[in-house]
């Protein structure tokens, strides 16, 4: 699947989401932060480097497993988190970051987030540095018990710290469990 196809898919999902929100005005109330939500443990499974570069011989898609501890809103509407991920190629990434919940009604939550941390590539994609940055978002459905099920899309790169900076994209299914 090429970058153009992925971009078109993301645009289509965005258009469908906007059409759905427009069709359901009661759900279109947007609020920032989730102050009543407790801390959560999030577990994810998906794919690492879904668009491997043809210019790097070691770049290939791998399975990814992720675990995060997400603190409740701490700085107004901003919630910190700590996490780690591993891939089937032996890569490991330990990171810390910040996210902001954007609530579309009581159930749908979009969480843009950014993180930074230490990366060990294993035998997989060479990202060019031991220090990597991750940006992305998660769209999740919040259940009555405050657990969430969603999809996360992230881009990880060294932001130009080194000459080699191919970056990678990940897509994961995430389930988060409230700690109450």
Identify the residue ranges that each predicted region occupies.
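Transmembrane beta-barrel strands of outer-membrane/channel proteins
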Residues: 43-47, 65, 82-86, 100, ...
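Solvent-exposed loop/turn segments connecting transmembrane beta-strands
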Residues: 50-63, 84-95, 106, 122-130, ...
């Amino acid at each position: 699947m090429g970058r153009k196809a992925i971009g078109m898919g993301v645009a289509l999902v965005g258009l469908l989401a906007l059409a759905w929100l427009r069709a359901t005005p009661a759900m279109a109330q947007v609020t920032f932060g989730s102050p009543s939500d407790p801390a959560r443990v999030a577990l994810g499974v998906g794919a690492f480097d879904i668009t491997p570069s043809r210019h790097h011989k070691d770049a290939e898609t791998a399975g990814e497993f992720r675990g995060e501890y997400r603190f409740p809103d701490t700085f107004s509407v901003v919630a910190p988190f700590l996490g780690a991920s591993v891939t089937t190629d032996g890569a490991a990434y330990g990171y810390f970051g910040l996210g902001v919940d954007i609530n579309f009604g009581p159930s749908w939550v979009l969480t843009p987030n950014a993180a930074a941390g230490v990366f060990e590539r294993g035998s997989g994609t060479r990202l060019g540095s031991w220090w990597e940055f991750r940006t992305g978002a998660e769209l999740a459905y919040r259940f009555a018990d405050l657990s969430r099920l969603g999809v996360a899309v992230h881009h990880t790169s060294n932001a130009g710290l080194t000459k080699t900076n191919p970056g990678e994209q990940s897509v994961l299914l995430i389930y988060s469990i409230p700690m109450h």
